[in-house]
């Protein structure tokens, strides 16, 4: 069955000036809103603990709920856009997010906050984000206009990463966390209303059947993979880190990931048959068999892989070791956002003549430089000025890659599949970030644990009893001096050994962070040559 569709071919060229870009402004507002909802929660942690009696595990669960649901349902959101229409999908997503913020603002129960508010946020984002990407493809059919639009979305991601926590934090400090969530509810309400003014994109002329079985399979598979990867640092890779967390004597993390991959393989086989029978599916064969599209998805994931790794290594070190306050961290994030803003907007306009492949290779190269700068900027109890270069080059590199990634994906397939690709693009972002956090988090924790145990065992300043007790600690997380002292107070009986252990941890903490930066640099360097081979060696940003 023909899988093309009639999609207002000149919608993006019929208007000029403000009228031409008004829809993009609305879409950018939606993108910034989803980033604000996701990042704002971390700022509200203390308020939730104090006012709702939330525990640390409750906060962790609340933080995980949004990305888990959004990540599992994004692909389904991409197909719903074809069935409902992208404009309707956009407004349903905005409405769900508005309702989620209202519940978050007025509930007095942390369980309602987690399972109602955060779940609805995840579902809302799984509709809204694919709709934003799908509408850009449908509205801006000229390649130059589309490149500018995708570059603007990339810039919005960079700005929102810094602005959202600052605004959320200001509202919490000035009023309270409920006012902050009320403000988000009003914001998404405005986005919903503005959705009526979006350019209309015609739905496919052929009636499309929704794939319920595929939705269940992909949701289970992605959830298993994401949870398994994120739990490696808590459960262990092979050997269990806790006696209560094991399956037949091994960590459940890897079996869970393998189970998820097996389910996703079944999902792909199901999708092939479903598309043959019905003409459309969650994962069209063009997504699976088109090399250019696959590399485009790798680039979507690469941006968030680097972002996740940078936040995990860089921001964590600044706050726990260097003692950065919220305002100090904001300055670092502003440097990052400035870099991302510059390149995401300049690349499709000032460098439209440069090939996509070369731009992506340059962008990843900047990320390699950023990782080396992170390693060089890391000191025993602080970070130096080189560390700010890491933030800048991370932003510059991610901005270049993000400006090209969606273009590469949408240019690889027909118009209908291009609009549907928003869901799989968003999913690749989530998976990329998950891999970044999982891999670098594991390197950070396992190397730190091994270094502390090894240095303690070889130290002449520590008693034999203390060495044995250190060896018995399953894992040593990345902690501030204060928190590390509390850890050894629970596990080490010889108080005279505490100063030596704290010094050992400081050295190991620095070395493990530097090692993690170098692993990130190596992974990015390898990606330059392995993940860009099928990206077009010509520009996709020139006017069509």
Where on the chain are the PLM-derived regions?
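Transmembrane-helix exit segments and adjacent C-terminal regions of multi-pass membrane proteins
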Residues: 1-23, 273, 468-544
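Transmembrane core module of solute transporters
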Residues: 24-63, 69, 251-255, 275-416
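A generic transmembrane-helix signature of 12-TM secondary carrier transporters
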Residues: 31, 94, 100-101, 117-118, ...
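Interfacial helix-cap and linker-helix signal at transmembrane-aqueous boundaries
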Residues: 48-49, 80-81, 167-175, 229, ...
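Helix-to-loop junctions at the C-terminal end of transmembrane segments
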Residues: 74-86, 172, 343-356
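Helix-loop-helix hairpins in multi-pass membrane proteins, especially solute transporters
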Residues: 82-221
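Hydrophobic transmembrane-helix bundles of small-molecule transporters
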Residues: 173-298
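Small-residue-rich alpha-helical segments with characteristic i,i+4
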Residues: 387-473, 532
């Amino acid at each position: 069955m023909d899988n093309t569709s009639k999609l207002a071919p000149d919608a993006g060229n019929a208007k000029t000036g403000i009228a031409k870009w008004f829809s993009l402004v609305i879409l950018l507002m939606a993108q910034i809103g989803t980033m604000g909802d996701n990042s704002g929660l971390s700022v509200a942690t203390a308020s939730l603990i104090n006012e709702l009696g939330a525990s640390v595990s409750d906060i962790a669960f609340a933080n995980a709920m949004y990305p888990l649901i959004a990540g599992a349902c994004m692909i389904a959101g991409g197909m719903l856009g074809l069935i409902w229409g992208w404009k309707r999908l956009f407004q349903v997503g905005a409405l769900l997010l508005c309702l989620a913020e209202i519940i978050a603002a007025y509930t007095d129960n942390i369980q309602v906050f987690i399972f109602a508010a955060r779940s609805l946020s995840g579902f809302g984002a799984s509709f809204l984000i694919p709709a934003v990407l799908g509408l850009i493809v449908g509205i801006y059919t000229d390649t130059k206009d589309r490149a500018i639009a995708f570059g603007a979305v990339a810039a919005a991601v960079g700005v929102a990463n810094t602005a959202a926590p600052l605004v959320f934090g200001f509202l919490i400090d000035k009023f309270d966390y409920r006012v902050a969530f009320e403000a988000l509810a009003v914001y998404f309400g405005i986005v919903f209303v503005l959705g009526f003014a979006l350019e209309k994109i015609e739905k496919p002329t052929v009636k499309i059947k929704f794939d319920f079985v595929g939705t269940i399979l992909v949701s289970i598979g992605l959830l298993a993979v994401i949870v398994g990867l994120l739990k490696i640092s808590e459960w262990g890779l092979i050997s269990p880190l806790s006696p209560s967390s094991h399956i037949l004597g091994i960590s459940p993390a890897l079996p869970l990931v393998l189970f998820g991959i097996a389910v996703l393989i079944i999902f792909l086989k199901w999708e092939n048959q479903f598309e043959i029978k019905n003409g459309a599916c969650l994962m069209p064969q063009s997504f699976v068999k088109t090399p250019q599209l696959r590399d485009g998805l790798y680039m979507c994931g690469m941006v968030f892989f680097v972002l996740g790794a940078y936040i995990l290594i860089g921001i964590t070190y600044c706050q726990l070791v260097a003692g950065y306050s919220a305002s100090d961290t904001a300055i670092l994030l502003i440097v990052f956002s400035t870099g991302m803003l510059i390149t995401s907007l300049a690349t499709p306009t000032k460098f439209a003549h440069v090939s996509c492949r070369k731009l992506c290779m340059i962008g990843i190269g900047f990320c390699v430089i950023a990782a080396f700068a992170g390693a060089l900027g890391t000191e025993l109890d602080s970070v130096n000025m080189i560390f700010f270069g890491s933030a800048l080059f991370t932003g510059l590199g991610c901005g270049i890659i993000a400006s090209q990634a969606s273009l590469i994906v949408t240019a690889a397939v027909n118009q209908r599949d291009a609009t549907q690709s928003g869901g799989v693009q968003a999913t690749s972002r989530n998976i990329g970030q998950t891999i970044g956090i999982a891999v670098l988090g594991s390197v950070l924790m396992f190397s730190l644990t091994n270094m502390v145990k090894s240095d303690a065992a070889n130290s002449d300043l520590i008693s034999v009893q203390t060495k044995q007790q250190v060896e018995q600690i399953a894992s040593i997380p990345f902690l501030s001096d204060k928190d590390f002292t509390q850890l050894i107070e629970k596990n080490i009986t010889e108080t005279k050994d505490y100063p030596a252990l704290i010094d050992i941890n400081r050295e190991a903490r620095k070395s493990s962070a530097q090692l993690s930066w170098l692993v990130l640099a190596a992974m990015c360097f390898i990606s330059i040559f392995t993940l860009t081979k099928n990206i077009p060696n010509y520009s996709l940003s020139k006017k069509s």
